[in-house]
């Protein structure tokens, strides 16, 4: 076991949604130490330009590598869709992304109608278009941008009248079309499971890919000889914005009361590399 194998895995999201992925990683890979970074100062990413997302994601992930992370999990569907090819081109550590769980949804659906709730940026990306073309099969796929949901979740609001009103508007057309499976295509959306069940009852099977991502990470670390052993260190939590929402969400989700640290990962003009790579397919 090398010293490098005991280094942390960096888990990155534009905000707090990636905590759902961190929870899955801790369950699947309890020996791995984790460093979670929320780029909350710049959230949400979902309605920003592809060039901005690629550049900002690269900047943040370079910072995580500088902190000693042995691998990175991009726990953000939007950042994965727009920037994972940038990261794999530029960084010397394994990079694991997330994508909407369309394949398991298609395998699960009995009505052959599947809903996808994701950010506008994810749904417009070439990566999602390829996924849709390759995985939808004989299913009808209804894609819906989740406008307004991420800012509410970032404030810890997962079940208010405002949240329920938005969800009803987004889900009712899917239910009317006889959808029986819903892909949670943003890592924030697992926090809305209770609210979704209140609206849809048991009519929708929810597909959350957090555990699949964790298992993929485990296989990648094993192949690279980077699996940790022994007792994991307590996770470190960092944010480029206000740390209080992060601390509150960790307490609610993980039952812990960490002291999150605020970090500054400065802005800069869009780099030519990121602008060029953002327009390339993965």
From Swiss-Prot:
Residues that coordinate or bind substrate: 13-14, 45-46, 77-78, 187-188
Group of enzyme by EC: isomerase
E.C. number: 5.1.1.3
Superkingdom in the source lineage: Bacteria
Active-site residues (renumbered): 76, 186
Record-level GO BP terms: cell wall organization; peptidoglycan biosynthetic process; regulation of cell shape
Catalytic reaction list: L-glutamate = D-glutamate
PROSITE patterns per UniProt: ASP_GLU_RACEMASE_1, ASP_GLU_RACEMASE_2
A GO MF term: glutamate racemase activity
Pathway annotation from the record: Cell wall biogenesis; peptidoglycan biosynthesis
Sorted UniProt keywords: Cell shape, Cell wall biogenesis/degradation, Isomerase, Peptidoglycan synthesis
Function: Provides the (R)-glutamate required for cell wall biosynthesis.
UniProt similarity note: Belongs to the aspartate/glutamate racemases family.
Record-given protein name: Glutamate racemase
């Amino acid at each position: 076991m090398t010293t490098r194998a005991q280094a942390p895995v960096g888990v990155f999201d534009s905000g707090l949604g990636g905590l759902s992925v961190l929870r899955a990683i801790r369950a699947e890979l309890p020996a791995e130490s984790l460093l979670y970074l929320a780029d909350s100062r710049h959230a949400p990413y979902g309605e920003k330009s592809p060039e901005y997302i690629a550049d900002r994601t690269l900047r943040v992930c370079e910072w995580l590598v500088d902190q000693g992370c042995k691998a990175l999990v991009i726990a953000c569907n939007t950042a994965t869709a727009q920037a994972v090819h940038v990261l794999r081109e530029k960084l010397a550590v394994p990079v694991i992304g997330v994508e909407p769980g369309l394949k398991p949804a298609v395998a699960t659906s009995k009505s052959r109608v599947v809903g996808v709730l994701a950010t506008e940026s994810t749904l417009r990306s070439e990566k999602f278009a390829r996924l849709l073309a390759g995985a939808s099969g004989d299913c009808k796929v209804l894609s819906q941008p989740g406008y307004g949901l991420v800012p509410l979740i970032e404030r810890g609001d997962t079940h208010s009248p405002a949240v329920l009103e938005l969800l009803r508007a987004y889900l009712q057309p899917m239910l009317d079309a006889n959808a029986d499976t819903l892909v949670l295509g943003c890592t924030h959306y697992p926090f809305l499971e209770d609210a979704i069940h209140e609206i849809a009852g048991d009519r929708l099977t929810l597909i959350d890919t957090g555990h699949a991502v964790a298992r993929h990470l485990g296989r990648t670390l094993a192949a690279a000889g980077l699996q940790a052993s022994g007792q994991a260190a307590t996770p470190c939590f960092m944010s480029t914005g206000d740390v209080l929402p992060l601390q509150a969400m960790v307490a609610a989700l993980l039952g812990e009361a960490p002291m999150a640290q605020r970090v500054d990962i400065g802005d800069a003009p869009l780099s030519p590399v990121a602008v060029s790579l953002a327009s390339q397919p993965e």
